């Protein structure tokens, strides 16, 4: 969600208007707490990079339905090599098992597009690539392949991090 605050008034009252905007922004920050991640308009991948650099932390990705799209966006940011270690595109279940340590039983019971599997993908890539953080995705992109239980458009996303 993006929120833009604007207040209009005479130019002679510019200082008073700026004070109102600042007070409104501060109230919103208190209300949103840690759910607010930026006060300026920047792409999410750039903000993630700035945060990782500031913390001295690293990131990896494990992608199925996004096919490397997240990694592409992360690496589109200048300087991303300082924090992005790499990614694994694991479309096939065998790759999920071999490269990401996904439990074959969970694939059989829950399927590749499921909470337990995507969590294991995130943990697996974080451990395999030795990063602080990992993002994993698995889903049914369509146009076919969906079911009543898992329709086209179903996506699971997991983040694995320290602690």
Sequence positions of predicted segments:
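Short alpha-helical segments enriched in small residues
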Residues: 15-163
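Terminal amphipathic helices with adjacent charged low-complexity linkers/tails
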Residues: 1-23
